[in-house]
Design a protein with these regions (language model features):
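Short glycine-/aliphatic-rich beta-strand segments at the starts of folded cytosolic domains
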Residues: 14-20, 55-61, 92-104
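Short, low-order "capping/linker" segments at domain edges
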Residues: 93-114, 135-149, 166-190
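Single conserved hydrophobic/aromatic residue that forms the stacking wall/gate
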Residues: 1-13
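Conserved short beta-strand edge segments in small beta-sheet-based binding/regulatory domains
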Residues: 79-91, 120-127, 152-166
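Ordered, amphipathic secondary-structure segments that act as subunit-interaction surfaces
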Residues: 64-111
Length: 190
């Protein structure tokens, strides 16, 4: 195979969990590292952890093994980064959220029934519109948006993905600064 074809076949979507110090400017430094090196972020979510001194960033990007390894090494060099982990794709709980404001008109009941199929909830109801909130994986959220589109989406916003590794595993900032899951997209050595 041609090297470019081989490389394209090895591309995979990876979620990174990054524990950082909860300080002003940290998000800018991490995002700047991605930008300076030409890495595209597909999804980003940041929030406080159980320890208010730290925040957890969930970053999703599509890349080959070498790029994933390089990103982890570059992140680990940042002083504010306490730990980086590439989450195992099949052993992680992942969710995003979407809010969709749709024109209701005389289709209100129909829209409520459709939303129920996706386990979406109406979070605002007015005479002319409904705002629905749905959570799940991207495929489910994309399908929900596609179903709502013919009714006239007035506004929409989607969060970045949040993810945690399933089971008893937990990131310990006192250990290795970055780690890889056992998977077919794992580099041979760090």
């Amino acid at each position: 195979l041609h090297p470019r074809v081989r490389r394209q076949r090895q591309m995979c979507i990876r979620d990174r969990s990054i524990v950082v110090r909860n300080q002003p400017g940290v998000l800018m430094r991490v995002a700047g590292m991605f930008s300076r090196r030409g890495f595209n972020i597909d999804s980003l979510a940041v929030g406080i952890t159980q320890n208010p001194e730290f925040s957890r960033m969930t970053v999703t990007m599509q890349a080959d093994d070498a790029t994933i390894k390089q990103v982890c090494k570059q992140l680990a060099k940042l002083v504010e980064v306490e730990a980086v982990k590439v989450l195992p794709p099949k052993a992680s709980a992942k969710r995003s959220m979407v809010m969709v404001k749709v024109h209701a008109g005389d289709k209100r009941l129909e829209l409520l029934r459709l939303a129920d199929v996706f386990r979406a909830h109406a979070v605002d109801v007015t005479g002319e519109s409904l705002i629905f909130l749905a959570t799940g994986i991207d495929d489910k959220l994309n399908a929900f948006v596609d179903v709502m589109r013919p009714y006239g989406i007035l506004e929409m916003v989607q969060t970045g993905l949040v993810a945690l590794e399933r089971g008893d595993a937990a990131m310990d900032v006192s250990k290795s600064r970055y780690s890889w899951p056992e998977s077919s997209c794992k580099p041979s050595a760090i």
